[in-house]
UniProtKB/Swiss-Prot annotation:
Role, per record: Catalyzes the conversion of S-adenosyl-L-methionine (SAM) to carboxy-S-adenosyl-L-methionine (Cx-SAM).
EC number: 2.1.3.-
Pfam families recorded: Methyltransf_25
Family: Belongs to the class I-like SAM-binding methyltransferase superfamily. Cx-SAM synthase family.
Classification via CDD domains: AdoMet_MTases
Name of the gene encoding the protein in the UniProt record: cmoA
UniProt-recorded name of the protein: Carboxy-S-adenosyl-L-methionine synthase
Record-linked SUPFAM superfamilies: S-adenosyl-L-methionine-dependent methyltransferases
Naturally occurring in which organism (per UniProt): Campylobacter jejuni subsp. jejuni serotype O:23/36 (strain 81-176)
């Protein structure tokens, strides 16, 4: 379904409810620049470097796009998805079933989730929705539950520290969304709904959190304007 949720002024803060879940795939493909290309980059990289029967857990898996792509690349992977939205998981499970894929899903708040050890954790556009006081604690848990040589892939919308640059990048991003078919009204309405829900950090703040969690080898593998993907390795 086409995302037309914000053709009217929002009556509440943004949440991943049934209305969002029903249009999520269209929404994210039109709202996150190079979403599919970045998803495929990360998936192909993991398929190339991970050992047989590696375990991958997608934290904030939404409609399971990444897990489904990964499952079709490597049949041996053990795949898990966690999300706090029952509506999103309903879509994820339905899609996985349609593809005949064996993916385990958990409905949970990530800050309260009973983590298990994995080779890879993925958090694509997830941390930005976690309340700031809880983010470091969550990253600490992720690091602790990674196997030796484990990997974290983390994609985030980011802030620029320079105010002039930040203003212009934000305007370019709005231009991008207009080119994807969103009106100025829709863009402003969604921004209003996301206020104090999606709270981005700067690149430096994200790197500092990763380092504080224990990661020593961290690289940026994708960036477009105010969107960036980090890969971090556990020693």
């Amino acid at each position: 379904m086409k995302d037309e949720l914000f053709k009217q002024s929002p009556k509440k803060q943004f949440e991943f409810d049934k209305s969002v879940a029903s249009v999520f795939d269209d929404m994210i493909n039109r709202s996150v620049p190079f979403y599919r290309e970045n998803l495929e980059l990360c998936g192909n990289l993991l398929a190339k470097i991970l050992s047989t029967n590696a375990s991958v857990c997608d934290l904030g898996c939404s409609s399971a796009n990444f897990l489904i792509f990964l499952a079709n690349l490597r049949k041996d992977f053990k795949l898990f998805g966690v999300d706090n939205s029952a509506s999103m998981l309903e879509v994820a499970k339905s899609k996985a079933k349609a593809y005949g894929l064996d993916i385990s899903f958990f409905e949970a708040n990530l800050c309260e989730f009973d983590f298990f050890v994995c080779d890879v954790f993925v958090a694509n556009y997830t941390m930005q929705f976690i309340r700031p006081p809880k983010r470091q604690e969550l990253l600490d848990k992720i690091y602790k539950n990674l196997n030796s040589k484990g990997i974290l892939i983390m994609s985030e919308k980011i802030l620029y520290e320079d105010a002039f640059l930040s203003k212009n990048i934000i305007e370019l991003y709005a231009d991008y969304k207009e080119k994807q078919g969103y009106s100025k009204f829709e863009i402003a309405a969604k921004r209003e709904a996301l206020e104090n829900v999606l709270i981005p950090y700067s690149q430096k703040e994200n790197l500092n959190m990763l380092e504080k969690a224990g990661f020593k080898k961290i690289e940026s593998i994708f960036k477009w304007a105010n969107f960036e993907t980090f890969i971090a390795f556990k020693d």
